[in-house]
């Protein structure tokens, strides 16, 4: 299994368990699905003998419904105005460029060339995006984007390809 980590925050952003493709040589696009993760209480952990109780009260099951990628990776939703996002992406791109210059110099030109098309995709559809940081909520780290396919039911997420490092398990 391969885990993809943000180069700035070190947060695990996703794994190779999801359907993934490269988009514009700038993003990894992952297709997700809406799921519910149960967060109920394990009655065996409470103790006592339920059959000996006079009145048995049922415990409500709780859960989290959302995109399976967001839930599994514990991504945290955040908000941006268009102006705030432009400031963020400029700063984040500088960090990625520094990382590439030091660690993957062969990707510097590709990153620069793909940036314009990638940002055009994001800004042209800005009102539809939801934004997610890694679990640590590091404001300097990667902010992944989520939208829905034309069917309105299938979520997909974009992660900055050059802002990730692979770790094999």
From Swiss-Prot:
Which Pfam families does its entry note?
Answer: TCTP
Cysteines paired by S-S bonds: none
Gene Ontology CC: cytoplasm
Q: Where in the cell is it found?
A: Cytoplasm
What PROSITE patterns does this protein map onto?
Answer: TCTP_1 (PS01002), TCTP_2 (PS01003), TCTP_3 (PS51797)
List, for all copies, the residue spans of the domain called TCTP.
1-169
Please tell me whether the keyword Calcium is annotated for this protein: yes
Q: Which domain of life is it from?
A: Eukaryota
Q: Which UniProt keywords apply?
A: Calcium, Cytoplasm
The record's annotation in Gene3D superfamilies points to: Metal Binding Protein, Guanine Nucleotide Exchange Factor, Chain A
GO MF terms, alphabetically ordered: calcium ion binding
Q: Please give the family membership noted in the entry.
A: Belongs to the TCTP family.
Name the job this protein performs: Involved in calcium binding and microtubule stabilization.
Question: What is this protein's name?
Answer: Translationally-controlled tumor protein homolog
Organism listed in the record? Branchiostoma belcheri (Amphioxus)
* Highest classification ranks of the organism: Eukaryota, Metazoa, Chordata, Cephalochordata, Leptocardii
